[in-house]
Amino acid sequence: MCLSLVGSEMCIRDRYNFGPCLSPTNAFHILQGLETLPLRMQRHMDNTRALLDFLTTHEDVAWVRHPDLPDHPGHDIAKRLMPRGAGSIIAFGVKGGREAGRAFIEAVELSSHLANVGDAKTLVIHPASTTHSHIDADAMKAGGLSDDMIRLSVGLEDVADIKADFESGFKAARRAAAE
């Protein structure tokens, strides 16, 4: 409020565009994080590639979407613009539909059930039964979402542990699909 009464137009515009000054503590934490960013991103991408291989060949997976996969519509662009990998977000479908997807999410223990992305820990969510459960089937389909879709944000854990966690999820999904 004070800025709008006494500040210059340029000062107001800068404050609007860039926000207030960082506190020294926040600046310190950002600098600390930047020191290890390349290492963390490399681990994210290594884990993502390993999980893409795992998911694309898994018998309980109906489909996998990620720009690093050759059948993705944006593959050529992603390969050109992001030669080290197109990020650690994967979407895949669990065979068995909505209930199988929900069972998968409820069975995993290492992976956190959160809607966030880009964390150090692996995050999974079943949009059809959580964030998009209030949307009708036609609107979900129009938005590119399906009942079997799991959104995965790959974390930094040991990839063997993530795979073992997912196997527990797939086992639960098979049981749910059989019911």
Regions found by a protein language model. Give the residues of each.
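Conserved small-domain helix->loop->beta segment predominantly found in fold-type I
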Residues: R49-N116, K121, I135-K141
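PLP-dependent enzyme catalytic core of the Aspartate aminotransferase-like
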Residues: E106, T122-E179
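TM-loop-TM module centered on a large, flexible mid-protein loop between adjacent transmembrane helices
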Residues: R13-N17
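A conserved active-site cap/scaffold subdomain adjacent to cofactor or substrate pockets
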Residues: G19-D53
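Short, flexible turn/loop "capping" segments at secondary-structure junctions
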Residues: L22-N26, M82-G85, A142-D147
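Single conserved hydrophobic/aromatic residue that forms the stacking wall/gate
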Residues: M1-G7, C11
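Short, well-ordered beta-strand elements within core beta-sheets of diverse protein domains
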Residues: H29-L39, S88-K95, R151-G155
